[in-house]
Protein backbone atom coordinates (compact mmCIF):
# COMPACT_ATOMS: atom_id res chain seq x y z
CA UNK A 1 0.00 0.00 0.00
CA UNK A 2 1.04 3.56 -0.69
CA UNK A 3 -0.14 6.61 1.21
CA UNK A 4 -0.10 10.35 0.70
CA UNK A 5 0.08 12.77 3.61
CA UNK A 6 -1.33 16.28 3.18
CA UNK A 7 -0.18 18.44 6.07
CA UNK A 8 -1.24 21.97 6.91
CA UNK A 9 1.90 24.01 7.56
CA UNK A 10 2.80 23.94 11.24
CA UNK A 11 1.39 20.46 11.83
CA UNK A 12 4.30 18.42 10.48
CA UNK A 13 4.96 17.02 13.97
CA UNK A 14 1.58 15.24 13.94
CA UNK A 15 2.57 12.73 11.24
CA UNK A 16 5.04 10.41 12.98
CA UNK A 17 2.49 8.31 14.89
CA UNK A 18 0.39 7.83 11.76
CA UNK A 19 3.39 6.82 9.68
CA UNK A 20 4.66 4.43 12.37
CA UNK A 21 1.21 2.81 12.58
CA UNK A 22 0.96 2.48 8.79
CA UNK A 23 4.33 0.77 8.65
CA UNK A 24 3.29 -1.60 11.43
CA UNK A 25 -0.07 -2.47 9.82
CA UNK A 26 0.95 -2.73 6.17
CA UNK A 27 3.76 -3.36 3.79
CA UNK A 28 4.23 0.27 2.79
CA UNK A 29 5.81 0.25 -0.66
CA UNK A 30 8.52 2.89 -0.73
CA UNK A 31 8.16 6.03 1.27
CA UNK A 32 4.99 7.78 2.30
CA UNK A 33 4.61 10.85 0.08
CA UNK A 34 4.36 14.14 1.97
CA UNK A 35 2.91 17.45 0.79
CA UNK A 36 2.77 20.48 3.06
CA UNK A 37 0.27 23.20 2.21
CA UNK A 38 -0.02 26.74 3.61
CA UNK A 39 -3.59 26.48 4.88
CA UNK A 40 -6.67 24.36 5.44
CA UNK A 41 -8.43 25.17 2.14
CA UNK A 42 -5.34 24.19 0.15
CA UNK A 43 -5.58 20.60 1.37
CA UNK A 44 -8.29 19.97 -1.24
CA UNK A 45 -6.00 20.64 -4.20
CA UNK A 46 -3.17 18.61 -2.68
CA UNK A 47 -5.51 15.67 -2.05
CA UNK A 48 -6.86 15.91 -5.60
CA UNK A 49 -3.31 15.87 -6.98
CA UNK A 50 -2.60 12.72 -4.98
CA UNK A 51 -5.77 11.10 -6.35
CA UNK A 52 -5.25 12.20 -9.94
CA UNK A 53 -1.49 12.18 -10.41
CA UNK A 54 -0.02 9.50 -8.13
CA UNK A 55 -0.48 5.84 -7.30
CA UNK A 56 -1.27 6.27 -3.60
CA UNK A 57 -4.03 4.08 -2.19
CA UNK A 58 -5.27 6.62 0.37
CA UNK A 59 -4.66 10.15 1.56
CA UNK A 60 -4.32 11.18 5.19
CA UNK A 61 -5.02 14.88 5.81
CA UNK A 62 -3.52 16.56 8.87
CA UNK A 63 -5.69 19.56 9.78
CA UNK A 64 -5.71 21.85 12.81
CA UNK A 65 -8.36 21.16 15.46
CA UNK A 66 -11.84 22.02 14.20
CA UNK A 67 -12.28 24.60 16.96
CA UNK A 68 -9.38 26.64 15.54
CA UNK A 69 -10.63 26.78 11.94
CA UNK A 70 -13.21 29.22 10.59
CA UNK A 71 -16.39 27.10 10.28
CA UNK A 72 -17.08 28.11 6.67
CA UNK A 73 -13.51 27.20 5.65
CA UNK A 74 -13.71 23.85 7.43
CA UNK A 75 -17.10 23.00 5.89
CA UNK A 76 -15.95 23.94 2.39
CA UNK A 77 -12.73 21.97 2.82
CA UNK A 78 -14.47 18.84 4.07
CA UNK A 79 -17.00 19.11 1.21
CA UNK A 80 -14.13 19.37 -1.27
CA UNK A 81 -12.37 16.35 0.21
CA UNK A 82 -15.63 14.37 0.13
CA UNK A 83 -16.05 15.21 -3.56
CA UNK A 84 -12.59 13.80 -4.26
CA UNK A 85 -13.50 10.61 -2.40
CA UNK A 86 -16.61 10.22 -4.54
CA UNK A 87 -15.11 11.33 -7.88
CA UNK A 88 -11.88 9.34 -7.63
CA UNK A 89 -12.79 6.43 -5.31
CA UNK A 90 -9.87 7.59 -3.20
CA UNK A 91 -10.08 6.96 0.55
CA UNK A 92 -9.33 10.21 2.39
CA UNK A 93 -9.26 10.41 6.18
CA UNK A 94 -8.72 13.53 8.26
CA UNK A 95 -7.64 14.46 11.74
CA UNK A 96 -11.07 16.07 12.17
CA UNK A 97 -12.62 12.58 12.29
CA UNK A 98 -9.58 10.82 13.74
CA UNK A 99 -7.47 13.23 15.85
CA UNK A 100 -5.11 10.48 17.01
CA UNK A 101 -2.45 9.55 14.43
CA UNK A 102 -2.80 5.82 15.08
CA UNK A 103 -6.59 6.00 14.64
CA UNK A 104 -6.11 7.98 11.44
CA UNK A 105 -3.75 5.35 10.03
CA UNK A 106 -6.01 2.46 11.02
CA UNK A 107 -8.99 4.17 9.36
CA UNK A 108 -7.01 4.65 6.14
CA UNK A 109 -5.92 1.00 6.06
CA UNK A 110 -9.47 -0.17 6.82
CA UNK A 111 -10.88 1.88 3.96
CA UNK A 112 -8.23 0.73 1.47
CA UNK A 113 -8.81 -2.91 2.44
CA UNK A 114 -12.58 -2.47 2.12
CA UNK A 115 -12.20 -0.89 -1.30
CA UNK A 116 -9.88 -3.66 -2.53
CA UNK A 117 -12.27 -6.34 -1.27
CA UNK A 118 -15.29 -4.72 -2.89
CA UNK A 119 -13.47 -4.17 -6.19
CA UNK A 120 -12.35 -7.81 -6.23
CA UNK A 121 -15.89 -9.04 -5.59
CA UNK A 122 -17.29 -6.75 -8.28
CA UNK A 123 -14.89 -7.86 -11.03
CA UNK A 124 -16.85 -9.42 -13.84
CA UNK A 125 -20.17 -8.33 -12.39
CA UNK A 126 -20.11 -4.73 -13.51
CA UNK A 127 -23.42 -3.53 -14.92
CA UNK A 128 -23.41 -1.10 -17.84
CA UNK A 129 -25.40 1.88 -16.61
CA UNK A 130 -24.68 4.15 -19.57
CA UNK A 131 -27.59 5.61 -21.49
CA UNK A 132 -27.65 5.12 -25.27
Labelled PLM ranges:
Residues 87-91:
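A short helix->loop->beta-strand "cap" motif at the edges of active sites that frequently abuts
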Residues 1-34:
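Glycine-rich phosphate/diphosphate-binding loop of Rossmann-like nucleotide-binding domains
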Residues 23-53:
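Active-site rim loops that border cofactor/substrate pockets in soluble metabolic enzymes
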Residues 13-20, 38-42, 72, 76-79, ...:
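Conserved active-site and cofactor/substrate-binding residues in soluble primary-metabolism enzymes
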Residues 92-100:
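Proline/glycine-rich low-complexity loops and linkers
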Residues 23, 27, 49-52, 82, ...:
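Generic secondary-structure signature for well-ordered alpha-helical cores
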Residues 102-132:
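A charged, well-structured terminal subsegment
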Residues 42-85:
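Glycine-rich phosphate-binding loop
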Amino acid sequence: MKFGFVIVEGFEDKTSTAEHTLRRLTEVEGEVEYRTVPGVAETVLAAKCFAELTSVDAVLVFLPAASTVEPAVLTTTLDGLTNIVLDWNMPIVTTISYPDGAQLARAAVTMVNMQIEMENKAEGRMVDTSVN
